[in-house]
Amino acid sequence: MFKSCLKSMREEKGLSQSELSKKSGVPLRNIQAYEQGYNDINKAQVITVLKLAEALDCDVYDIINPR
């Protein structure tokens, strides 16, 4: 399992997984897998991480590095 800070960042912004999916264009299943640790967000495609960072109004570094 891979630890990601994506869930805490999403919750800080007050977004559900579904809302983040719609806002970022990243499939809901991918977001769930990153948050649950089934997929390593550090191995995600660059465009995916960029979309998530833009949707969360944060730096890419904030997403790929655990807190």
Identify the role of each PLM range:
Residues 1-14:
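A short, Lys/Arg-rich alpha-helix, primarily the initiator
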Residues 6, 20, 31-34, 63:
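Conserved hydrophobic/aromatic packing and binding residues within compact polymer-binding modules
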Residues 10, 21, 53:
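The alpha-helix within a helix-turn-helix
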Residues 26-41:
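Recognition helix of helix-turn-helix/homeodomain-like DNA-binding domains
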